[in-house]
Amino acid sequence: MMMMRNIFTAFLRKRATSEKFVISECNLKKCQREFCQTTTECDRSPLKGIRVLDLTRIVAGPYCTMVLGDLGAEILKIERPGGGDEARKWGPPFFEGTQESTYFMSVNRNKKSVCIDLKRGKDIIYDLAQTCDVLVENYVPGKLNSLGLGYEDIAKVAPHLIYCSLTGYGSQGPYANRPGYDVIAASLGGLLHITGLKDGPPCKVGVAMTDLAMGLYAHGAIMAALLQRSKINKGQWIQCDLLSTQIASLINIASNYLNGNKEATRWGSEHESIVPYEAFPTKDGYMTVGAGSDLQFQELIKRLQLPELINNDKFKNNIARVKNRMELLQILRDVFKRKTNKEWSAIFEGASFPYGAVNTIKEVFDDPHVKYTKLVQELEHPVTGKVKLVGPPVTYSYATNIVRSSPPMLGQHTSEVLKNILKYSDEKIENLIAQKIVQ
């Protein structure tokens, strides 16, 4: 009987030898966000030893598995021979002189690309599943079942496996068989309805936030399932879907309707329940300011040199400011237009209220604080030469959460994985390649 992999083996071993759990010291430098190649002996990655069978494409699934990979899991990205992940061709922009899309590069670091025809290579997937801890997929419900790769099929050969399905609408219900994209779920889930100018049409958010949110939900769910597996010694099926993710992300907007019977509307950059809280036009751009408390508002108007507003009953508290929104905002907008973003930033330096210029993407990466965080990492890539990636936003005092390797080329690790993990012979691998079952 195959031994279950246990993410807490090392922890339990320590506990068995000592009542007090002591973290071993090693000479691994504190990389935090910096790219580094850790040694086997000193790898402090929380998910070291966890292997993920990644059958996802596009954004939500790859984002989920990328987060797991940053934390040290070994990610085996299963791709379609010949084309691979559709996002590889989502451009322009492409890296100069290549057909590698910058889109694909953004969510596929720390992974190994293995090309397998799922229909003809089903047995290879079974073999891999037995060596893995987690399987993540984002096919339309029923697709993998038809190939013999659904949860029940995989559970028969790998009962220890955490099987996570990411779908548009779940595996049951009126919409279950529909394909799902971020913007469609954001439309059905109300996000587009509440996004945009007050008098304008519904507006798509600038990045695929529903996809990213589902990827984060899935990553957290997988971590919890791994923790539970260490207690119950078996796997389970996790289901995440875009529509549920989007509706759960409505937070106060949903509560306003469910408990206050209040339909939401578009507010531009304003906040429905807090005033002032918006992006104010300045002499050369926009400056976003949020005064969420009365004390913050009082400091704001002092720094704006508007002492006449301090004792004005129309603005004495947030309830009054919301009621008299238009009058107050017109005053503030007129003042903000008099200076540049740089001038306002100097005036607001050290303030108790939050503020920030509306940056272009160039300005984001030129920002001195962003540079200080070392979020941007540059890695070698066999085709593009260099690739710059935004690294993990979370750091640990002990654990490593890092960029280890650049996004893989299509099928870059197929032979390596089949030989080293599955112990397939060179002859067997060559036959699979000749039959175009793998690439």
Predicted region positions:
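N-terminal helix-loop segment corresponding to the beta1-alpha1 unit
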Residues: 3-14, 19-231, 266, 409, ...
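Glycine-rich beta-alpha junction loops
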Residues: 82, 169-170, 242-248, 284-286, ...
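Short, surface-exposed loop/helix-turn segments at secondary-structure junctions
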Residues: 88-92, 256-266, 367-382
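A short glycine-threonine-serine/GTX helix/turn-capping micro-motif
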Residues: 202-213, 235-237, 267-271, 275-277, ...
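Oxidoreductase and adenylate-handling cofactor-binding alpha/beta cores
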Residues: 215-235, 248-261, 301-308
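Aromatic-enriched alpha-helical interface/lid elements that frame and gate functional surfaces
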Residues: 275-351, 355
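A glycine-rich dinucleotide-binding beta-alpha-beta segment and adjacent secondary-structure elements
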Residues: 350-401
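C-terminal active-site "lid" helix and adjoining low-complexity regulatory extension at the edge
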Residues: 387, 392-426
